Amino acid sequence: MFKYIGDIVKGTGTQLRSLAMVFSHGFRKRDTLQYPEEPVYLPPRYRGRIVLTRDPDGEERCVACNLCAVACPVGCISLQKAETEDGRWYPEFFRINFSRCIFCGLCEEACPTTAIQLTPDFEMAEFKRQDLVYEKEDLLISGPGKNPDYNFYRVAGMAIAGKPKGSAQNEAEPINVKSLLP
């Protein structure tokens, strides 16, 4: 009998403690932000919408190496390589399906030219799913993005039609390795 009364007192005490806790939270600062009215805090390394950048000369950085599409775990990136008259590669089309993208950043890490960069933009809501498929024209921005001075063709030393090896900027003359042998 006393055990039964003890359980009732214990249960009532638990309920009263819960009610007091809920009531006290009514007067505290709210943790939930009302999004459109209050701005959202984004961490410095937040990964949002993907963009394609340009090099300092104004040319698009993407060389259509297809590493981003291979690194993408969900396969939302597709592109087709084309070549200019001087031998540079560029994407004939570059397509990202943002309805499948998980914003993991693996495409940004895989890109050797830093053409793909993730921005803190997260407002991409659309009424139709096909509007979330972005083409190259939608992704290409006018600026260099996070690396303003980087130019892949200056650093890589790739041969360009009409230029001998060793004549590009930041490229040393080729060394004849056989002359170094004893």
Curated annotation (Swiss-Prot):
Key word Methyltransferase present: no
Keyword Magnesium part of the UniProt annotation: no
Biological process per Gene Ontology, one example term: aerobic respiration
UniProt function note: NDH-1 shuttles electrons from NADH, via FMN and iron-sulfur (Fe-S) centers, to quinones in the respiratory chain. The immediate electron acceptor for the enzyme in this species is believed to be ubiquinone. Couples the redox reaction to proton translocation (for every two electrons transferred, four hydrogen ions are translocated across the cytoplasmic membrane), and thus conserves the redox energy in a proton gradient.
Catalytic activity, EC: 7.1.1.-
Name under which the protein is recorded: NADH-quinone oxidoreductase subunit I
Protein family per UniProt: Belongs to the complex I 23 kDa subunit family.
Catalyses which reaction(s): a quinone + NADH + 5 H(+)(in) = a quinol + NAD(+) + 4 H(+)(out)
Enzymatic class: translocase
Membrane topology per record: Peripheral membrane protein
Names of required cofactors: [4Fe-4S] cluster
Gene3D superfamilies: 3.30.70.3270
Binding sites annotated in the UniProt record for [4Fe-4S] cluster 2: C72, C101, C104, C107
CC terms in the record's Gene Ontology section: plasma membrane
Keywords, comma-separated and alphabetical: 4Fe-4S, Cell inner membrane, Cell membrane, Iron, Iron-sulfur, Membrane, Metal-binding, NAD, Quinone, Repeat, Translocase, Ubiquinone
Gene: nuoI
GO molecular function: 4 iron, 4 sulfur cluster binding; iron ion binding; NADH:ubiquinone reductase (non-electrogenic) activity; quinone binding
Location of the 4Fe-4S ferredoxin-type domain: 52-82, 92-121
Cell compartment(s), UniProt: Cell inner membrane
Lineage: Bacteria, Pseudomonadati, Pseudomonadota, Gammaproteobacteria, Pseudomonadales
PROSITE patterns linked to this entry: 4FE4S_FER_1, 4FE4S_FER_2
Subunit comment: NDH-1 is composed of 13 different subunits. Subunits NuoA, H, J, K, L, M, N constitute the membrane sector of the complex.
Cofactor mode of binding and number, as noted: Binds 2 [4Fe-4S] clusters per subunit.
Annotated positions binding [4Fe-4S] cluster 1: C62, C65, C68, C111
SUPFAM superfamilies: 4Fe-4S ferredoxins
